[in-house]
Amino acid sequence: MEKLILGLDPGLAVLGFGLIKCIYNSKTEKIDSTSLVDFGVIKTTKKQEMGQRLVTIYEDLHTILNNFKPDLAATEKLFFYRMGNTILVAQARGILILALAQNEIPLIEFTPAQIKQAVTGYGNADKYDVQQAVARELNLEEIPKPDDAADALAVALTASWLN
């Protein structure tokens, strides 16, 4: 069985996405192979009005969903850490939840510690350790750039293992 998993790292200025394909053994339901399909970012600028920034995120994400038709999406749970930044991330997150719901794509969420633990084996791993693990798991010669895309791939890998 084949499954396309979309990992998302929400942000208003930069929203990272990473898409992986997992092939599961039909008898054991364990993963036989995982491969990179695509990754990148959706960017907006402070010069754009808020509504236009959200429209950009929605339209670009909608294009990704239509082009790839993922079976599952995953993202990091939103935690309150800085009021202004949390509100901006929450707005972008609302747009991605809407786009996924409209396309009937299930969404699962993980804490940062769950993602770090799944990808590196250590819940307090730093960003570089996570990025190296992503490159290793997907047989990439280099760490995916930018960081937001690498983070999204870490979320997708976590979903493939924990879902």
UniProtKB/Swiss-Prot annotation:
What binding partners and quaternary form does the record give? Homodimer which binds Holliday junction (HJ) DNA. The HJ becomes 2-fold symmetrical on binding to RuvC with unstacked arms; it has a different conformation from HJ DNA in complex with RuvA. In the full resolvosome a probable DNA-RuvA(4)-RuvB(12)-RuvC(2) complex forms which resolves the HJ.
Instruction: Provide the organism lineage as a comma list.
Output: Bacteria, Bacillati, Cyanobacteriota, Cyanophyceae, Oscillatoriophycideae
Just give the chief location class: cytoplasm
Q: Which cofactor does it need?
A: Mg(2+)
Keyword Ribonucleoprotein assigned: no
Give the protein family: Belongs to the RuvC family.
| Record organism | Trichodesmium erythraeum (strain IMS101)
Q: What does this protein do?
A: The RuvA-RuvB-RuvC complex processes Holliday junction (HJ) DNA during genetic recombination and DNA repair. Endonuclease that resolves HJ intermediates. Cleaves cruciform DNA by making single-stranded nicks across the HJ at symmetrical positions within the homologous arms, yielding a 5'-phosphate and a 3'-hydroxyl group; requires a central core of homology in the junction. The consensus cleavage sequence is 5'-(A/T)TT(C/G)-3'. Cleavage occurs on the 3'-side of the TT dinucleotide at the point of strand exchange.
Gene3D superfamilies xref list: Ribonuclease H-like superfamily/Ribonuclease H
Q: What is this protein called?
A: Crossover junction endodeoxyribonuclease RuvC
